[in-house]
């Protein structure tokens, strides 16, 4: 992909919270001593009275977020994916999802792209853990534009939402007039008839690159961005599989 602007979706998360915070006074942000890393420090600077640093106590943070939600607040609990989905799984399951509490979880540093932070922080199982929880929406944006749209959609959605954001800067690929984001609805980024490539998050840009390289070899690949893992856009996936006969994820 030629020279394009790159932005880390964790930075987009922080920026989106600030913009939403200006419109909605009931929006509050919680952190577990990682405001700088999760990029929610910008919200803390803008709205210090609506930011709660819970310290290195992710389980408690989820419980506090649940409590705030019962008072009419819309809390965004923010930490690394490893701690949000791993360490605090019981609280997310029992204190947030089971009673259908309106809490949004902003999980940054997902996947192996955390790099030098090491294996203890490289959470690859968060999607699997979160998607099996009844009532939990699970999503992962492909770029800055999608991340901001996702945060706004999460605020509007009534119920728990888990969002994974990345540490590394990724290309902006959705900067177009017809872009529309909707939770649970995949986006066809490239039409094709020979096979379908399905991706989300930071894998979407490489998927588009792969499709271009395949085209040079005479293979026409469809590329779908499945930004929402749950609820999955089954209709789009099945239709693409029937159309192309081959699916790569």
Segments from the language model and where they lie:
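Thiamine diphosphate
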Residues: 1-164, 169, ...
